[in-house]
């Protein structure tokens, strides 16, 4: 279980935000947020626009529920570094540490995150994901009807590389090491899609659009 009372080692200090500011972190769409505890909206948020895309790494100091709808030409890829699976879910399915997320621009996405959740995200144009899928599979979309995919992103060789890649983002974004590489979007897209395609069926929970 993740303890949201403290701040994890190596994580930037939590700051107090208003919900309107946090709701605009994705920039291309608003996130509707509802507080579920008395901690108040405290978080650490690092983000950078790079190569037509948005990189974001965040730590939540409060429990909340949210919903958003991506515009038709955007997709969202992400990785859960830490969370409480008893309190965190996406479309009714528990979110676990080590899980990778792919959200396509169809319908409303609903989720809940526990205090102490740490995650990294890549918001990128849908055409770039389609191009990568075509490059690796000769098709430009996920299996029919699959608009949201969850899979374990820290098992297997390719998935381990994916976990390591996402783990680099906080240091890149806060400038403590090196800046984002020029090809950071391409690298992350390639490893995310490879891990998604290679993941076994039992590692990809079936997602509905309802809690």
PLM regions with names:
Residues 36-70:
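Conserved short histidine dyad/triad with adjacent acidic residue
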Residues 2-40, 86-211:
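Alpha-helical bundle regulatory/interaction domains
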Residues 50, 69-72, 95, 114-116:
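A generic fold-level signal
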Residues 60-87:
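Glycine- and acidic-residue-biased ligand/ion/polar-headgroup-sensing regions
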Residues 47, 55-57, 76-77, 100-102, ...:
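Conserved hydrophobic/aromatic beta-strand scaffold that supports enzyme active sites
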């Amino acid at each position: 279980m993740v303890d949201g009372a403290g701040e994890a080692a190596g994580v930037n200090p939590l700051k107090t935000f208003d919900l309107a500011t946090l709701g605009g972190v994705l920039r291309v769409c608003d996130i509707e947020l509802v507080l579920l505890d008395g901690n108040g909206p405290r978080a650490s948020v690092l983000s950078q626009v790079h190569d037509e895309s948005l990189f974001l790494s965040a730590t939540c100091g409060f429990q909340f529920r949210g919903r958003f709808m991506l515009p038709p030409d955007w997709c969202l890829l992400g990785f859960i570094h830490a969370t409480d699976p008893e309190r965190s879910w996406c479309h009714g399915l528990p979110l676990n540490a080590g899980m990778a997320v792919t959200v396509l621009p169809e319908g409303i996405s609903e989720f809940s995150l526990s205090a102490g959740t740490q995650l990294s995200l890549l918001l990128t144009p849908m055409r770039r994901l389609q191009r990568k899928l075509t490059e690796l599979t000769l098709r430009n979309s996920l299996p029919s009807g699959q608009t949201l995919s969850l899979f374990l992103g820290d098992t297997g060789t390719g998935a381990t590389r994916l976990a390591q890649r996402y783990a680099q983002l906080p240091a890149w974004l806060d400038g403590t090491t090196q800046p984002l590489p020029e090809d950071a979007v391409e690298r992350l897209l390639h490893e995310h899609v490879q891990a998604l395609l290679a993941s076994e069926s039992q590692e990809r929970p079936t997602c509905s659009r309802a809690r």
